[in-house]
């Protein structure tokens, strides 16, 4: 298996079953803010840069989907009244994906976005939706207690399987079984904490289908 292709699966998410969330009303009460993730990610203002750890490519992908499909379910990211948890790949994650898809090293954010956009707007939309778990504001502390959880995403009932180790590490199972399991970026959790919509940075793009 191509090493770059294996890196495509190194994604991560901070997850907890909805049933566990129901058992923790105090946590829910602390997340009543309505600032949307689109606001936090500065949708409409993102610019490509040299920072591999931020989310410019993701934001541009969201913008592209909504420009072409204004009624896409992706628009929920701009509705701060709707609770959800999003797992947002860094720019480095998208560069790795673009490199694997094009069989050459993609060094710039603009170049990576071009490769990803070339997959077609419907594919980009599906990939984005696979990174969203609707209906729950999931914080990292809860995620570390969620070993064995299966979370239904916004993509056609597709799920993400969660395994938590003692390291600690949060490892995910997606739909690319031959690739290395994804992991969470523990230094990029609880983005937009205090609001109904939270995000956690991940180090690769989650795959809803096998490559």
In which residue ranges do the predicted regions lie?
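Mature, structured domains of secreted/extracytosolic soluble proteins
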Residues: 2-211
């Amino acid at each position: 298996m191509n090493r770059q292709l294996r890196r495509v699966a190194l994604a991560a998410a901070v997850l907890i079953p909805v049933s566990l969330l129901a058992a923790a009303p105090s946590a829910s009460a602390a997340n009543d803010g309505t600032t949307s993730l689109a606001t936090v990610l500065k949708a409409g203002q993102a610019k490509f840069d040299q920072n591999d750890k931020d989310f410019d490519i993701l934001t541009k992908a969201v913008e592209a989907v909504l420009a072409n499909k204004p009624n896409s379910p992706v628009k929920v990211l701009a509705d701060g009244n709707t609770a959800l948890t999003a797992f947002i790949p860094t720019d480095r994650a998208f560069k790795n994906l673009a490199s694997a898809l094009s069989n050459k090293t993609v060094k710039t954010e603009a170049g990576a976005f071009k490769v990803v956009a070339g997959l077609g707007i419907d594919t980009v939309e599906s990939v984005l939706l696979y990174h969203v778990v609707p209906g729950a504001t999931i914080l990292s502390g809860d995620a570390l207690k969620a070993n064995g959880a299966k979370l239904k995403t916004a993509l056609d009932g597709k799920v993400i399987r969660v395994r938590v180790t003692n390291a600690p590490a949060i490892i995910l199972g997606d739909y690319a079984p031959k690739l290395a399991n994804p992991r969470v970026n523990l230094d990029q959790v609880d983005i937009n904490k205090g609001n109904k919509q939270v995000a956690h940075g991940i180090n690769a793009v989650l795959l809803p289908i096998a490559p």
